[in-house]
């Protein structure tokens, strides 16, 4: 029986010898027979040499130094071998180990450099790919330590908790807890869950228009759906089975079946968050007359036909339809229309609600819709580029004369013939005075008429034109050094190229917007863009081409008669400059009279809090054209079709005299004489 197989018979001692300066050698000693187990991977002759070398390992260090380099540089180690495998002997020279270690080190360093380069390239590719998303800030959801809070209720003798995450919605999406409620059957929803859904749906304008009892019924039967871009929700020619509320996203209404025209039409019929569609198809058995397609990822709240009929939601839809009919019937323009024709017009439009300050149309002149004002008011605005108006050009240089003391004609591009002739005279005879020639001619003319001329002219000294002497003082101020922009009237400072929104008209209930110059030849039309801004209104929008198909001669004559011309940009610019002069004068006067009285030396100066709005954002200061001061406030830019964005202002402060110089009664600050 082999004693090496018995773990107790194995040698309990192992000899490990390290000589870092020499070599590394690992060998195992056998028990009793002194034999060594040979590795099956080594030949027999090699095992013999290994035994002879292991015996010489017990010599002194001085003898090891004298031996050959192959057998000298070694470190011997004797370890017990497991019973299931023979002893293994590994011998490598020190030079080989150094080379292998250096190669491994270089290989790892090279691999590390390659990994770093690869990571940099990947990061660069991600940055280039995400260039379009720089406006958005990607925030990872942070785990909250205490996502809910609770308090003790004395009446119920229990703790009431409120979980904030159940009601949290990201980027306007439908809350997850609300989605889980809508996935239940209507009969399984509790009263509290229905009330929670009703509170969440208050964000939709069309939902708020219903009565409270009907809102609870809708919250009980409603279900949630989410569809991606280009998904057709309602197809033309099919039966309608559902009624949709738009919670998030945008849909388009088209005439084709696949909805592809919505992505090609420059002015598609769009419905946004808070809109609804599909209710008319549930009131009758007729097929759908239009296709509804998603323009982006959209979230819907859907009411099916059986729930729609069971909860008598059709009565509310009929009320809205009757409301539109009554509105159109009361307008003078439709008094001659028949009932059938008017009901067709009612089917073409739908009621939309816009909050205060919400833009209805960027350019209703080129829009595809006609807007009827049912309730509330709207404003018609015009963005006037002041740099394109001659009145503004003259006004700017008149104000800047206080800085450079140069007349307006110097900055003109075109010079009148009279001014051109004067310049020719000055260039031909520079710095010369011809006043004596006029006096001589005047004296001769009066002598011929027999009129005595008092005063004599020294002809000897004035035979030649005299040069301008030091008595004539030229008044030149410092030059205004700033970047200039060429306009059709001349040069203007770049900072002075601004725009202003001017209110043209305020609409009332019953007015129609979008029929301005509708039947005027296209060459004679006013193609300027006009903005329609809501002040809290309820509107009905109808497509122009469908409305024009229904217009008869009598209605056309009424439309032409009610047409009104809008003022030109030049008139709007002049009215703005007049109003601006009054605004600036009023501010200066209030500052002169009121501010000195409000100052108190005993009140410590308090640091102003940072605010979102800064009055300097909408204020242009022509006095600081030369000052290169970094602006610490935002400015508002309005996009233009073929030109760079235009800065929008509300007032312009120009160089001006002090009020004390113009009005002596305000000489002392805070005192009116």
UniProtKB/Swiss-Prot annotation:
Task: State the residue spans of region: Disordered.
Answer: 1-89
What spans are recorded as compositionally biased (Basic and acidic residues)? 43-86
Localization annotation: Cytoplasm, Cytosol
User: Record-annotated residues binding a nucleoside 3',5'-cyclic phosphate?
Assistant: 206-329
GO CC annotation = cytosol
Q: In which tissues is it expressed?
A: Testis-specific. Exclusively expressed in testicular germ cells while it is not present in mature sperm (at protein level).
The UniProt regions of compositional bias labelled Polar residues, in chain numbering, are 1-15
Q: What InterPro entries does its record include?
A: cNMP-bd_CS (IPR018488), cNMP-bd_dom (IPR000595), cNMP-bd_dom_sf (IPR018490), RmlC-like_jellyroll (IPR014710)
Per the record, the domain of life is Eukaryota
Q: GO biological process: any one?
A: spermatogenesis
Keywords for this entry? cAMP, cAMP-binding, Cytoplasm, Nucleotide-binding
Q: What is its main location?
A: cytoplasm
Q: Does the keyword Cytoplasm apply?
A: yes
Q: Name one Pfam family in it.
A: cNMP_binding
Effect of gene disruption? Males are either infertile due to a lack of sperm resulting from spermatogenic arrest, or subfertile due to impaired sperm motility. The motility defect is caused by altered Ca(2+) regulation of the flagellar beat of sperm.
SUPFAM superfamilies referenced in this protein's UniProt entry, alphabetically:
cAMP-binding domain-like
Q: So what does this one do?
A: Essential for male fertility. Plays an important role in spermatogenesis and regulates sperm motility by controlling the development of the flagellar bending of sperm.
Name this protein carries in UniProt? Cyclic nucleotide-binding domain-containing protein 2
- Native organism is Mus musculus
């Amino acid at each position: 029986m082999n004693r090496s197989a018995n773990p107790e018979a194995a040698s309990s001692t192992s000899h490990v010898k390290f000589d870092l300066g020499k070599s590394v050698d690992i060998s195992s000693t056998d028990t009793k027979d002194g034999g060594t187990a040979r590795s099956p991977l080594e030949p027999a002759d090699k095992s013999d040499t290994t035994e002879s070398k292991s015996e010489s390992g017990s010599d002194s260090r001085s003898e090891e130094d004298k031996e050959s380099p192959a057998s000298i540089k070694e470190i011997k180690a004797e370890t017990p071998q497991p019973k299931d495998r023979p002893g293994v002997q590994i011998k490598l020279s020190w030079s080989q180990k150094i080379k292998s270690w250096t190669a491994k080190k270089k290989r790892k360093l090279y691999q590390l450099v390659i990994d770093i380069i690869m990571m940099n390239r990947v990061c660069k590719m991600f940055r280039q790919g995400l260039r379009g998303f720089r406006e958005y800030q990607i925030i990872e959801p942070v785990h909250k330590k205490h996502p809910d809070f609770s308090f003790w209720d004395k009446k119920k003798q229990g703790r009431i908790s409120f979980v904030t995450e159940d009601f949290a919605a990201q980027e306007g999406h439908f809350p997850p807890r609300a989605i889980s409620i809508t996935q239940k059957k209507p009969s399984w929803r509790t009263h509290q869950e229905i009330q929670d859904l009703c509170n969440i749906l208050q964000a939709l304008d069309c939902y708020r228009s219903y009565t409270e009892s009907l809102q609870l019924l809708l919250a009980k039967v409603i279900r949630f759906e989410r569809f991606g871009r280009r998904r057709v929700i309602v197809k033309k020619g099919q039966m309608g089975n559902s009624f949709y509320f738009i919670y998030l996203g945008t849909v388009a209404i088209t005439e084709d079946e696949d909805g592809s025209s919505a992505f090609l039409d420059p002015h598609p019929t769009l419905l946004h968050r808070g809109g609804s569609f599909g209710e008319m198809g549930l009131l009758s058995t007729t097929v759908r007359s239009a296709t509804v397609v998603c323009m982006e990822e959209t979230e819907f709240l859907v009411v099916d036909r059986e729930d729609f009929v069971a909860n008598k939601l059709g009565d509310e839809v009929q009320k809205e339809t009757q409301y539109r009919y009554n509105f159109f019937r009361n307008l003078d323009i439709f008094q001659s229309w028949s009932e059938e024709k008017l009901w067709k017009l009612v089917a073409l439009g739908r009621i939309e609600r816009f909050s205060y300050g919400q833009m209805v149309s960027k350019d209703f002149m080129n829009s595809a819709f006609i807007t009827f004002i049912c309730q509330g008011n709207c404003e018609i605005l015009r963005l006037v580029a002041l740099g394109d108006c001659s009145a503004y050009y003259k006004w700017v240089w008149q104000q800047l004369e206080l800085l450079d003391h140069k007349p307006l004609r110097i900055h003109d591009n075109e010079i009148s013939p009279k001014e051109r002739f004067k310049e020719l005279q000055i260039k031909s005879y520079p710095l010369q005075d011809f006043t004596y020639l006029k006096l001589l001619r005047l004296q001769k003319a009066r002598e011929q008429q027999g009129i005595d001329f008092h005063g004599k002219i020294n002809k000897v000294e004035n035979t030649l034109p005299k040069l301008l002497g030091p008595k004539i003082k030229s008044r030149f101020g410092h030059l205004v050094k700033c970047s200039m922009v060429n306009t059709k009237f001349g040069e203007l400072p770049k900072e002075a190229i601004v725009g202003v929104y001017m209110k043209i008209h305020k609409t009332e209930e019953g007015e129609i917007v979008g029929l301005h110059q509708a039947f005027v030849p296209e060459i004679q039309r006013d193609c300027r863009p006009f903005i329609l801004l809501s002040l809290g209104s309820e509107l009905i929008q109808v497509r122009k081409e469908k409305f024009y198909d229904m217009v008869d001669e009598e209605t056309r004559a009424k439309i032409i008669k009610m047409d009104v011309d809008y003022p030109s940009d030049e008139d709007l610019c002049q009215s703005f400059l007049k109003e601006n002069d009054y605004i600036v004068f009023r501010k200066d006067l209030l500052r002169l009279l009121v501010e000195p009285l409000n100052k108190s030396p005993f009140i410590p100066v308090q640091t102003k809090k940072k605010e979102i709005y800064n009055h300097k954002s909408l204020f242009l200061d022509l006095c600081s054209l030369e000052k290169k001061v970094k602006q610490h406030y935002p400015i508002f830019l309005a996009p233009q079709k073929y030109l760079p964005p235009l800065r929008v202002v509300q007032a312009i402060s120009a160089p001006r005299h002090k009020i004390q110089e113009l009005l002596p009664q305000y000489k002392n600050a805070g005192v009116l004489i």
